[in-house]
Curated annotation (Swiss-Prot):
Induction or repression: Expression is repressed by methionine.
Stored SUPFAM superfamilies: PLP-dependent transferases (SSF53383)
pH-activity dependence text: Optimum pH is 7.0.
Organism lineage: Bacteria, Bacillati, Actinomycetota, Actinomycetes, Mycobacteriales
EC number(s) from the headed UniProt entry: 2.5.1.49
Catalytic reaction annotation: O-acetyl-L-homoserine + hydrogen sulfide = L-homocysteine + acetate; O-acetyl-L-homoserine + methanethiol = L-methionine + acetate + H(+)
The species this protein was found in: Corynebacterium glutamicum (strain ATCC 13032 / DSM 20300 / JCM 1318 / BCRC 11384 / CCUG 27702 / LMG 3730 / NBRC 12168 / NCIMB 10025 / NRRL B-2784 / 534)
GO molecular function: cysteine synthase activity; O-acetylhomoserine sulfhydrylase activity; pyridoxal phosphate binding
Name this polypeptide is given: O-acetyl-L-homoserine sulfhydrylase
Pathway: Amino-acid biosynthesis; L-methionine biosynthesis via de novo pathway; L-homocysteine from O-acetyl-L-homoserine: step 1/1
Amino acid sequence: MPKYDNSNADQWGFETRSIHAGQSVDAQTSARNLPIYQSTAFVFDSAEHAKQRFALEDLGPVYSRLTNPTVEALENRIASLEGGVHAVAFSSGQAATTNAILNLAGAGDHIVTSPRLYGGTETLFLITLNRLGIDVSFVENPDDPESWQAAVQPNTKAFFGETFANPQADVLDIPAVAEVAHRNSVPLIIDNTIATAALVRPLELGADVVVASLTKFYTGNGSGLGGVLIDGGKFDWTVEKDGKPVFPYFVTPDAAYHGLKYADLGAPAFGLKVRVGLLRDTGSTLSAFNAWAAVQGIDTLSLRLERHNENAIKVAEFLNNHEKVEKVNFAGLKDSPWYATKEKLGLKYTGSVLTFEIKGGKDEAWAFIDALKLHSNLANIGDVRSLVVHPATTTHSQSDEAGLARAGVTQSTVRLSVGIETIDDIIADLEGGFAAI
């Protein structure tokens, strides 16, 4: 009698893998949906078995800070969708980004980044990493590969950027930036939060590591926090410059594992080092429940993202023709400075988070927001519900004037995360906002 078998799930299409990859039917109960394994620890078969798991000879579950069957199912599914060899889930997207950087850089090291960043990432880079002795340089023009090259220093350990920036809504030329990174023997880390693998797969475009907030489009309904890091498995962590290793943490024996060299772990070396080193020590663990919530969202990822983006195109066109709008930042518009990059990369969609400059200033922006009835004014994106926020006084309020300018945020900027409601209702609500100013 035929039985369910997803052992060759990587041969299936994206939508099928969104539902089936990474999770088998529960062996004990035959539960079809993913169970929530709400357990802190897992029983070993023997003393020898316990020793093998602690020595990384067997990568099965030990303690939920490191691995948990519910979380592992999520990680496997995300790795399949993003095209990576290993995924590590975290308690938030910020934790994923932080661990990606700390896996490569320490005191005295340097990171090169696009200036068009989510406000929390900018604060992480400018404040927290600085306290740890890690220097960060913002490239002058992230659309120009030579601007990235000009920012490189002898101690540079990574390049960082966002596929579609929050809130600028530009499109990063990932292949061009990856070429510069690799020319300098460093990896490119891409935040794929707004795109998700449903729209863009950065690892296929030359990136080496992907991070994303699961809180946003992957989960898709504002029900739980989460983050993920995906290892592309292709970067050579043994690379040297002037006869010295660029990434000594990967080729120097780790005393915690009796002399293990992470580079010897092969393709998933980056991801495994994050898991058994940083996640073990910092404890930014994703709960089994939030992992389960994310998996429920991923089931419908492609359907939701298509609706989000079709609605976003219509909203952007509406705003672009409105007399009370000064400017719309949305790469899907043909007059966008990033439309050519979108076409170069062969992208159908450019995300459903966009900003626009309202004519006037903060007072007009606030009046517009306060008059909306369908949109929720809150600090999140990627919800099925349409969302609105004033970035300068919320998500980017910790930035100084230079930081706001880098991110493309002014007092007139309004950010929309376009939901999946009926488009006529979304636009009617926006009309109501404009009528109030």
